[in-house]
């Protein structure tokens, strides 16, 4: 019977060895799977970092060229150069007739400008009021009224000169 007990112990040993070898193989496969998973995560992180860096570079390039892009877009949309610069962030101000004008489309600027003819007419009207019409009123303005002028005494004023 001892040889049966020895054979059983030998079979148990072989079963334990097979189980241990199976666990070692399984553990090695799990390590390989974890290693490939970690490598994939590292590669994804590298790709994400690369993409973030590209997006940051695009953002900086876009912001560096933003005023130029805004100006070009405004001009192509029909705004004049001053209004386009104002849209791009310029603090430039345009005054027309003593008033600050809002953003102006190129079609509106022509409507707002005064023609030289109107300015000359306005100057002629002011000149007519101050000088009169040639041939109708005297050239030196309106005549002074004729008549007696009243002398009004001023309190505290004397007519004699005193020497000090």
Swiss-Prot record:
Q: Which InterPro entries match?
A: Minor_structural_calicivir
Compartment(s) of residence: Virion; Host cytoplasm
| Top-level taxon | Viruses
Gene Ontology cellular component? host cell cytoplasm; viral capsid, decoration
Chief subcellular location: virion
Per UniProt, the keywords (alphabetical) are:
Capsid decoration protein, Capsid protein, Host cytoplasm, Virion
Q: What does the entry's free-text domain comment contain? A: The N-terminus domain points away from the virion surface.
Q: Which family does the record assign?
A: Belongs to the sapovirus VP2 family.
Question: What does the UniProt function comment say about this protein?
Answer: Minor structural protein that forms a portal-like structure at a unique three-fold axis of symmetry, following binding to the host receptor. The channel formed by VP2 may allow the delivery of the viral genome through the host endosomal membrane.
Known partners and oligomeric status: Homooligomer. The portal-like structure consists in 12 copies of VP2. Interacts with capsid protein VP1.
Instruction: Spell out the note in the miscellaneous section.
Output: Translated by a ribosomal termination-reinitiation process from the bicistronic mRNA coding for VP1 and VP2.
Official protein name in the record: Minor capsid protein VP2
Which organism was this protein described from?
Porcine enteric sapovirus (isolate Swine/United States/Cowden/1980) (Sw/SV/Cowden/1980/US)
């Amino acid at each position: 019977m001892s040889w049966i007990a020895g054979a059983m112990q030998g079979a148990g040993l072989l079963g334990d060895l097979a189980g241990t070898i199976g666990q070692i193989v399984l553990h090695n496969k799990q390590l390989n799977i974890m290693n490939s998973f970690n490598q994939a995560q590292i590669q994804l992180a590298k790709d994400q970092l690369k993409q973030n860096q590209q997006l940051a570079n695009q953002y900086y390039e876009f912001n560096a060229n933003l005023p130029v892009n805004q100006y070009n877009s405004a001009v192509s949309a029909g705004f004049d150069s001053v209004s386009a610069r104002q849209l791009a962030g310029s603090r430039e101000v345009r005054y027309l007739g003593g008033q600050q004008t809002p953003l102006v489309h190129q079609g509106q600027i022509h409507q707002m400008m005064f023609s030289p003819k109107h300015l000359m007419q306005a100057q002629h009207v002011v000149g007519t009021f101050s000088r009169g019409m040639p041939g109708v009123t005297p050239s030196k303005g309106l005549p002074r009224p004729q008549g007696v002028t009243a002398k009004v005494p001023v309190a505290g004023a004397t007519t004699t000169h005193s020497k000090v």
